[in-house]
């Protein structure tokens, strides 16, 4: 036998909205996203060691602001900017950047992407030396 009475009150519209904490825009601390990672250059292609080194180095970078990170060397925790034309894979059509940021992970293998706000969007992670760009070019 079914009950005819409803229990409680239906939720109010404001109760259904998710509350997301606001992060100050000028905080300057690093965020990482794999939202735009490209096929053949993702985490699945990395060895266990490479994944570990990637996370360890990124965790160290998170202790700095973007400004502080810019003071580090490119083969340390810092980065360099490389022109779009230097990369072997073609960037997604929607991206119009002329240069991309390149960081290093395991044994100086690079990973590249772009920064929007405080978020770094990874496009490519190199797992074999020379797959992402010719390292002899400048």
Language-model segment annotations:
Residues 109-111:
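Histidine-centered metal-chelating micro-motifs
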């Amino acid at each position: 036998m079914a009950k005819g009475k409803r229990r409680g009150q239906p939720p109010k519209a404001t109760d259904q909205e998710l509350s997301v904490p606001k992060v100050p825009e000028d905080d300057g601390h690093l965020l990482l996203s794999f939202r735009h990672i490209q096929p053949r250059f993702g985490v699945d292609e990395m060895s266990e060691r490479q994944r570990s080194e990637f996370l360890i180095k990124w965790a160290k970078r998170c202790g700095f602001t973007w400004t502080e990170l810019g003071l580090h060397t490119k083969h340390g925790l810092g980065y360099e900017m490389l022109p779009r034309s230097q990369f072997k894979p073609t960037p997604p059509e929607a991206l119009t950047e002329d240069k991309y940021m390149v960081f290093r992970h395991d044994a100086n293998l690079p990973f590249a992407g772009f920064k929007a706000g405080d978020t770094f969007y990874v496009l490519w992670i190199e797992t074999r030396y020379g797959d992402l760009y010719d390292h002899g070019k400048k």
